[in-house]
Amino acid sequence: MCIRDSGKNVDPARVSMTGISTITAEDAAFAESAGMKLKLLGRAIRQGEQIAVFVSPHFVAGAQPLAPVSGVLNAIEVLGNNIGNAMFFGPGAGGPATASAVLGDVVDIVRNPGRKQPVDWSAEPADLTDPDAFEASFFLRTKLDKAACEQALGEIRWLPDQNGFHGGFTGKTCRKAIAAAGLALDAVWPVLE
């Protein structure tokens, strides 16, 4: 979708990707206590002429249309000039859904031998911006003193502690600013509100 939006090539090697391996039981408990879900999201956010592209675990507000998407379902949410937010979802993971997609591609190739698939974008690279400069509210997990965290990052909306960890939500900031604060944080996840 990022390529379609920009009309230019997005090299996957330039996309910042963080998987789910560092999510903990405490993160899940914090999400539940806040009425949120933890989701692995791929995002492409236009910032002027540049695009911030990244994959990362997110805390997703329960009221968000993406919150109930689970299991083998995949979803995409797009913001259109005339329609606002639109979400499309359906099976996209797991054995049957993947097998169906691969089989559909094979059938298409057999039915249309020699057919060339047109590409609607330029080979010119898209102008990507540093995803660590993307501004949002962030969830923090830490064992540091809450007052020290607030002194460095401003007001934080704290949740009830989980197994000796503090967890809370910052105001609007970016990963660069959080990193520049020099705090030893155990997790920093963006929030989709």
Segments and roles (model prediction):
Residues 5-10, 16-22, 102, 159-172:
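Short, exposed beta-strand "edge-strand" segments with a Pro/Gly-rich flavor and a Y/T-containing core
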